[in-house]
Regions:
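A preference for well-ordered globular domain cores
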Residues: 1-189
Length: 189
């Protein structure tokens, strides 16, 4: 099926994931010279798709007693960014709709919380994905590459690099919150 073009390399790796065939079978099918590049290409695509799926799935936020879910498709991200711009420009509230909810008025503080939760998830996942991708690209066998799973603990130095980058992002989010609180206090005075 692979030779006839009916099955691509991703399909071969899916068959491995379902235990229908082994990596040894993939190597035999694509040839030893092509095995690493084929498996790596498919794995990089797989982890990219997994990263995107986690992001699009979105975030849950608790406002008082209410648990609210926000998907983070590209359109949703754009809407949330626009909401945050309203707050940055001095808006104190704005209507928006959580997934499965009705449109309601969110306060500036709630909009900031939505934005920060969304950006934190996006930054965490994309940073993790990029570090995992770098790690995968250092591997030298199809078997090693095939064993990689999105969500696994990163080995060093990738874990430290990710944590350092996320610490910078967290500091910036805290700076945003601080500036917003300062602006709100100034406006109330």
């Amino acid at each position: 099926m692979y030779e006839e073009g009916l099955l691509d390399t991703t399909g071969l790796l899916n068959a491995v994931a379902k235990d229908w065939i082994t990596i040894t079978d993939v190597i035999e099918i694509v040839g030893e010279d092509n095995a690493l590049s084929v498996v790596m290409s498919a794995k990089l695509s797989e982890i990219s798709n997994a990263c995107n799926a986690v992001i699009v799935n979105g975030v849950d936020i608790k406002f008082g007693e209410e648990n609210v879910h926000f998907n983070l498709s590209i359109e949703d991200q754009s809407n949330i960014n626009n909401l945050f711009c309203v707050v940055e420009l001095g808006g104190t509230e704005f209507p928006y709709q959580a997934d499965g909810g009705v449109c309601r008025i969110y306060t500036a503080a709630e909009i900031a919380a939505i934005y920060i939760a969304a950006q934190t998830l996006i930054t965490t996942q994309t940073t993790y994905h990029n570090e995992l991708k770098q790690y995968v690209q250092t591997l030298t066998s199809a078997e090693e590459v095939s064993a990689i799973q999105y969500g696994m603990t990163l080995p060093e130095p990738y874990l430290t690099e990710m944590n350092e980058k996320l610490a910078v992002a967290q500091q910036q989010m805290q700076a945003i919150v601080g500036r917003m609180q300062q602006a709100a206090a100034t406006n109330q005075a």
